[in-house]
Structure formats: structure tokens, C-alpha cells
From Swiss-Prot:
Lineage: Bacteria, Pseudomonadati, Pseudomonadota, Alphaproteobacteria, Acetobacterales
Top-level taxon: Bacteria
Name of the protein described by the UniProt record: Malate dehydrogenase
Coiled-coil positions: none
Molecular function as annotated in GO: L-malate dehydrogenase (NAD+) activity
CDD domains found in the cross-reference section: MDH_chloroplast-like (cd01338)
């Protein structure tokens, strides 16, 4: 018997990340080869023409799983009865724009979208925020949707996780698909902390195999943290395909399950690891049946604690900068 279609919203749907995302969703890369989807595509009024072109291309792919599309500039239409949301659209940082101005501009966007989700989305919806600053944008959307469980919201830190896994695999001479128990803690920003103290590949402890604290501190952590800037420098544009891929990875694991593997997700803190409750913070989790379970009781040494403090302080500053907008 055919499955009922899953409704999936994508915001910023005429943008570059969405262009790398929607075709993969429609092909079955997110939910598998037998799950039909209906795409709800949201973008600004002035982007509706370009969005129409994206929809023409989606039609021309003749995806058997694409059961329908909705194009709109109204969040309440876009989020009506959705099962999954990818909040990709965000205000980019303009020339001369201060970080607090960027936070304020995005607070307006994600307050409106959070309220719309609160009003019309399914109560079981899973909403991933991709648009930067992703952790704080997700926090704003969550706070603006008080009738939805905080567990409905996550921010994307999987791109950092994938970047770290690729770099670790190259350093250790292993297949990236074999790397497990890697963690990315904190904010999706250069302050995040990629932590391979527990990482394994093929039964080997990677920290023992690499055994190079200077490389960890001076090469690995800063390179992962600045990878997005390096892509912009080389490509002349920000990461789009890799961001879309990470969004698919994170939501697929969230909805379908991680099969016992540790994955990194930025989720509202429950107070564990000394992170104040409610802050959207990257932590190691396992997922099954849409339920996220934090990996508990991991040892935090002095260096790890110092890195957690750096990224936590940044998130606290971001939260304080937009607190008056949520009052």
C-alpha cells in the first residue's frame, strides 16, 4: 500500500542552498525510495519568478516521489500541516553590517516564521534551522512557537561534523564512512569545538592513532572552524551543496534514525554538560523513531571545558543581543 505524502517546507527556496536541497528531497535521498513528498516552497515576493523556474525544473525531473508542490511568500501557507521544515532562508551579512544588526534582522524573520509554525504546523513537526546564525535563529523560532515542543527544533551543526569527519579520516588514513563517535559541540560558528577524543574507525581509537595534540589544537580545530570562510575564498560563494547535504544527513538521522551511531545535533539544552537549559547547543546524540537521546556522562577534560566555555559564551552573547526582541 502506498504511503501518504510527507509535507516538507523549504524556506529561501529560490536560493543556492535550497537549489542543492530540493532535488535531493524529491529524489528520495531524505526519506527513502518509497516515501512520496509534497514540497512547500517559501521565498520573498520578489523571488517568486525565480522560484517558478525551480519548480519547472522539479517538474522536468519527473520524480516519481514528488506528489505536489506549493509556492508561496506567506509563512502560514508554507508551514500549513508540515511534517518537516528546512528553514534555509536568512538575512546574509551585508558589507559594514555589525553582528548585532545581523542578529536583529534575522530575529524578525525567525520570530515571524516561529509564530507561523506555532499556528499551522503539525504538532509533531521536525524543524531544522540552516540559515545563519543557525543556533540563535533556531532559538528564536523555538521561543516564538510556545505551543510546539522545544524538541521540534534543531539547528544544523552536521556540516561542521561532516567537515571534521573528512579531515580526521584523511589524517588517520581511514574511510570517512568508518569514522564514529565524533562530536561537534556548541555553536555553528568558528567557535564550535570538534572533539575526536572518543572517535573510532574500524575498532581503532583515532586520538591514539593520530596522537598529535599540536595538530588538534593548531590545525584541526581552526581548520574545521574556518572551513566555510575557506570555501567562500576559493569559490567566491558560500557552501551550498555541502550545506544541503548536511541538512539532509541531519534530518534523515533525526526522522529515520541513526542506527546507534553518534551524530552531532544542535538542540535545546536540558542542562547536561553544564550548558544552561534552553540554549541551542551542539551535542552528541543518538536518534531512533524521531526521538533524540543525548550521549550522557562523557568526560570533559580541562581543554575540552575551555573550548565549551568559548562557544557557550558566544551563544550567551547572541541570546542577550536578541532578548529584547523576544520580550
Amino acid at each position: 500500500m502506498a504511503k501518504s505524502p510527507v509535507r516538507i517546507a523549504v524556506t529561501g527556496a529560490a536560493g543556492q542552498i535550497a537549489y542543492a536541497l530540493v532535488f535531493r528531497i524529491a529524489s528520495g535521498a531524505l526519506l527513502g525510495p518509497d516515501q512520496p513528498v509534497i514540497l512547500h516552497l517559501l521565498d520573498l515576493p520578489q523571488m517568486q519568478g525565480a522560484l517558478g523556474g525551480v519548480m519547472m525544473e522539479l517538474e522536468d525531473c519527473a520524480f516519481p516521489l514528488l506528489a505536489g508542490m506549493v509556492a508561496t511568500d506567506d509563512p502560514k501557507v508554507a508551514f500549513k500541516d508540515i511534517d518537516i521544515g528546512f528553514l534555509v532562508g536568512a538575512r546574509p551579512r551585508g558589507k559594514g553590517m555589525e553582528r548585532k544588526d545581523l542578529l536583529g534582522a534575522n530575529a524578525e524573520i525567525f520570530t515571524v516564521q516561529g509564530r507561523a509554525l506555532n499556528e499551522v504546523a503539525k504538532r509533531s513537526a521536525r524543524v531544522l534551522v540552516v540559515g545563519n546564525p543557525a543556533n540563535t535563529n533556531a532559538y528564536i523560532a523555538m521561543k516564538s512557537a510556545p505551543d510546539l515542543s522545544p524538541d521540534c527544533f534543531s539547528a544544523m551543526i552536521r556540516l561542521d561534523h561532516n567537515r571534521a569527519a573528512s579531515m580526521l579520516a584523511a589524517k588517520a588514513g581511514v574511510n570517512v564512512g568508518d569514522v564514529g563517535k565524533l562530536i561537534v559541540w556548541g555553536n555553528h560558528s568558528p567557535t564550535m569545538y570538534p572533539d575526536y577524543r572518543f572517535a573510532e574507525a574500524g575498532g581503532r581509537k583515532l586520538a591514539e592513532a593520530i596522537n598529535d595534540e599540536a595538530w588538534n589544537r593548531d590545525v584541526f580545530i581552526p581548520t574545521v572552524g574556518k572551513r566555510g570562510a575557506a570555501v567562500i575564498e576559493a569559490r567566491g560563494a558560500s557552501s551550498a551543496a555541502s550545506a544541503a547535504n548536511a541538512a539532509i544527513d541531519q534530518v534523515r538521522d533525526w526522522v529515520v534514525g541513526s542506527d546507534g551511531r553518534w551524530v552531532s545535533m544542535a538542540i535545546p539544552s536540558d542542562g547536561s554538560y553544564g550548558i544552561p537549559e534552553g540554549i541551542m547547543f551542539g551535542v552528541p546524540v543518538t536518534t531512533q523513531g524521531g526521538v533524540v537521546t543525548r550521549v550522557p556522562n562523557l568526560a570533559i577534560d580541562a581543554f575540552a571545558q575551555s573550548r565549551l566555555d568559548i562557544t557557550l559564551n558566544e551563544l550567551k552573547e547572541e541570546r542577550e543581543a536578541i532578548a529584547h526582541l523576544l520580550a
